[in-house]
Amino acid sequence: MKSEIFIKKQNRLLDVRATAAQIARVQRDSGEIPWCPDQKTDPWDHVEAAMGLSIGGYLDEARRAYIWMKRTQNPDGSWYSAYRHGNVADRTRDANMSAYIAVGAYHYYMMTEDRDFLQRLWPSVQRALEFSLNLQSPHGEIYWAISPRGRVDRMALLTGSSSICLSLRCGLAIAARLGHQRPRWTAGLQRLENAIRNKPYRFNVTKSRYAMDWYYPILGGILVGSDARKRIGRNWKRFVVEGQGVRCVFDA
């Protein structure tokens, strides 16, 4: 019975405006967007929610979300992994979470063509991508974070690294729009893509039970064409529940 109800819901059209309105209701006066009322905020999901606001037509609210990012950025270009009501809840500095501001900034520009606001966000985008690239290893992968004690955690995550590729592409697109060149970002992107394509052993394989590790190299634009189709086909039966969708975690 539960499965039938779930499938029925999946056949309904998504009301984008209603979804964006719910995000706007959760947003705090500061611009911060937590997971849900009275819960934590992380920089990646905050930016994702800001893009949802833009898609739903809540452009002023989206701007407030990006201004919150600009205001809370650390001097080294990072953000902390979690905040609660404006206070730091987790001092881990995550490379992927920090880089994602580039995706949000470019998304807002593509929807509004507001070059002035893009220019306003540019310093934050620059510092964020430099922070992430400073965690790149000689082999191309990017270490996932700096711990609250200030130590680099030399573990690389495939999903996070794939997301960073998208962030770097968006950062390069912003740079081009504003008349800047960033050869270090181009080189870092190429090295990271090469690691994802050709050095899977550089990434934490224990995460392979998560569907994100399956599809993120495609979603991030690293694998395309026949390579993408092969990857999708290889684990389709493992992660896809026909008629329902993709399971988040596969436990045999």
Predicted segments — roles?
Residues 33-34, 46-51, 66, 79-89, ...:
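Glycine-/proline-rich flexible loop or hinge segments
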Residues 120-166, 175-251:
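Extended ligand-binding clefts on enzyme/binding-domain cores
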Residues 40, 44, 96-99, 155, ...:
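Residue signature of alpha-solenoid helical repeat architecture, marking inter-repeat boundaries
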Residues 10-11, 37, 41, 93, ...:
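Structural signature of alpha-solenoid helical repeat scaffolds
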Residues 1-9, 47-61, 100-117, 162-180, ...:
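Well-ordered alpha-helical scaffold segments within catalytic/enzyme domains
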Residues 57-129, 133-136:
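Helix-terminus loop motifs that line ligand-binding clefts
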Residues 30-32, 76-79, 86, 139-141, ...:
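Detector for glycine-centered tight turns/loop "hinges" at secondary-structure junctions
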